[in-house]
Amino acid sequence: NVEFAAAVFLNIGMDHISPIEHPDFEDYFASKLRIFAQAAAACVNLDCDHADRVLEAARKSCPRIITFSQTDPSATIFGSQVRKAGGDILFRVKTPRYSREFRLTMPGLFNVQNALAALAVCEAVGVPEQYAFAGLMKARVPGRMEVYANADEKVSVIVDYAHNRLSFETLFRSVREEYPGRRIVTVFGCPGYKAYDRRKDLGEISGQYSDLVILTEEDPGEEPVENICRDIAQYVAQGSSDYSIVPDRGEAIKQAVMSCDEPTVILLTGKGAETRQKRGIEYI
């Protein structure tokens, strides 16, 4: 019985499908769409897959529809002219109330889409333009595109929660664009006894985009880490990347850092700002 002032539909991909989650994509998608039944306004990304179906569901339930897009100028919130300025990202936004340039200090070109979603909510609830601008400029999320670099910036480490096909593809495309020519080392794993499709998806994507993949633990639970990593490795091997299996995550990160003898980006994905691992039935 919780009522929301606004509900955002940003994207949808194949995920959370397993014997203990959703039985298939249709069930997963339908579950996502149910949020509109509890919202006064629907904020819909016109650039997402299945946007027509999302809009149809929103119109059946919500009295107000706000759309956002980087490709469709007819959207309620339209973003364009995206460019880098030093470490910041600048982009222009047109809404029913104003047209102006915004600035993000959070890395990742894909965060422009997230910013447009936030501005759609601002439109829904009437947040003043100056507050929206100030909020986005200061926006930071622990475990989301956190960048660390050594003194000469030849080695950059990006910590991110990316953990499924959609987020992996988005992350790698952004890194390729923002760090051209850099060697890419990726450290990740998959959870135990669920979301089995991720092992294939993440293995294929990391093998395609990385120079080195180090497979490690990511909440293995009661499934042996080595078994999970071997499952992923068969798909990594289909790409051009070298790979290794290092079950202990701390040691895997250390090996990634020690492997850097040229300009490199290290991607530590899946865990974000989390500080625990699920091993067996306990969180350590």
PLM regions: where:
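ATP-dependent carboxylate-amine ligase
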Residues: 62-64, 97, 117-143, 147-284
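Acidic, Mg2+-coordinating active-site environments of NTP-dependent enzymes
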Residues: 2-157, 233-237
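Short acidic, glycine/serine/threonine-rich loops at helix termini
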Residues: 1-2, 54-56, 199, 278-280
